[in-house]
């Protein structure tokens, strides 16, 4: 989903991820570079004094580019790049152990996500996508209310890119593609009811279903034999 869609909130509700913890009740590991990024920004003193907010939308363009710009492939070592590299390292360690993961990202880059899906499937993973959808109006409102606000133009471009990719994602994931509408501001009890239904219908079924990927099946069988189990 796009920025301001409430992806992390929905992930917490659907998968049962306690706050300040990156593991779900079913053992899935949460992977989100924003966690490392916000940690580093606060560590290096980029909070707006006395507010606890990270008002990066108010930074001059050159400051934003020098600190929050770039990704793991960019030449300049920005705080964002360092966060991406930290997240990449953690994710690769999860992949080495074939641990289940919840990869929390925007999905604005279809080619990158499609490549990542192929890499995971080549290791034996079964993949599913939950697309968290919101209107642009709601995304802008949520962005203005959160501690780390994105510049409006960046949010709008990312939101539009994600929306244009929705049909492609549906084709890529097929029956393993689920859309969650998170446009409404729900009361806690209503949110629990809504997300509880989605969890029971889709999430629990996916998590509890044995691995179908033939590469994954072989990996599991091989490792059970190494441990002396049949």
Where are these regions (language model features)?
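Glycine-rich phosphate-binding loop of ATP-dependent small-molecule kinases
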Residues: 1-230
């Amino acid at each position: 989903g796009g920025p301001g869609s409430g992806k992390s909130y929905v992930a917490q509700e659907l998968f049962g991820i306690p706050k300040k913890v990156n593991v779900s009740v079913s053992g899935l590991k949460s992977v989100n570079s924003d966690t490392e990024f916000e940690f580093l920004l606060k560590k290096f003193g980029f909070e707006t004094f006395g507010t606890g907010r990270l008002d990066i939308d108010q930074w001059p363009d050159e400051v934003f580019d020098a600190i929050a710009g770039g990704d793991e492939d960019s030449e300049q070592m920005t705080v964002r790049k360092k966060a991406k590299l930290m997240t990449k390292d953690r994710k690769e360690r999860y992949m080495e152990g074939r641990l289940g993961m919840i990869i929390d990202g925007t999905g604005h880059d279809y080619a990158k996500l499609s490549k990542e899906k192929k890499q995971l499937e080549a290791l034996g993973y079964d993949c599913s996508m939950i697309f968290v959808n919101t209107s642009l109006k709601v995304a802008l409102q949520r962005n203005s209310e959160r501690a780390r606000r994105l510049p409006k133009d960046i949010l709008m471009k990312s939101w539009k890119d994600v929306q244009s990719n929705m049909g492609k994602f549906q084709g890529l994931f097929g029956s393993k593609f689920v859309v969650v509408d998170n446009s409404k501001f729900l009361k806690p009890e209503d949110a629990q009811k809504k997300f509880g239904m989605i969890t029971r219908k889709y999430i629990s079924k996916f998590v509890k279903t044995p691995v179908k990927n033939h590469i994954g099946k072989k990996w599991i069988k091989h490792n059970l034999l190494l441990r002396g189990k049949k």
